[in-house]
Amino acid sequence: MTLTNVAPLTASEIKQLAADWYLKLDVHAPLEEYIPFLAEEGLEMRFPEATVYGFDGFKGWYERVIGIFFDEVHTLKQVNVQPSADEASVQVIVKWEASVWNRPAAKSQRIILDAYQTWIIKRSLNTGKPVIATYIVDSLSYYEGSAQL
């Protein structure tokens, strides 16, 4: 669908979207705070462990992972934006650090990796703001000494 009379997506607003998204993930923000970031229709999110669709799919994934990972830190390393008519393809590299505790281990373990991702960003049909329509984790590159997923 092509939106008419809508400003083209800009690299600066997409970079801000990415920074805000990862800040929310770091603090395990309440679920409703993610609604403005995600496309109302056609949302697809491909994680290493699952592919989910729509906000309900995201909700199930998010509720699961915030029960597993803690002390998270996301550091944006790269956000490359390639705009087209009514969307933008974005290559994201984010350094992700998180702790995980697996029963009955005496201590938690630290995961440190770079996640290579592809996002498709569109303008919200309701607000006109940029939203994530497609979110794909393409690959993970672990740092030396990191625990593994």
State what each model feature region is.
Residues 31-83:
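A solvent-exposed, acidic/Ser-Thr-rich amphipathic alpha-helical stretch
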Residues 67-71, 97-112, 142-145:
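Short, cysteine-centered beta-strand-loop-beta hairpins and adjacent loop/turn segments enriched
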Residues 1-41:
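Short, low-complexity N-terminal intrinsically disordered segments enriched in polar/charged residues
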Residues 86-101, 115:
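A short hydrophobic beta-strand element
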Residues 38, 94-98, 136-138:
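Short beta-strand segments enriched in hydrophobic/aromatic residues
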Residues 13-14, 69-71, 76-78, 129-138:
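A broad structural signal for short, well-ordered beta-strand segments within beta-sheet-rich domains
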Residues 79-91, 120-131:
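A short, structured loop/turn motif at beta-sheet edges
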Residues 2, 109-149:
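Short beta-strand edge/turn micro-motifs at domain boundaries
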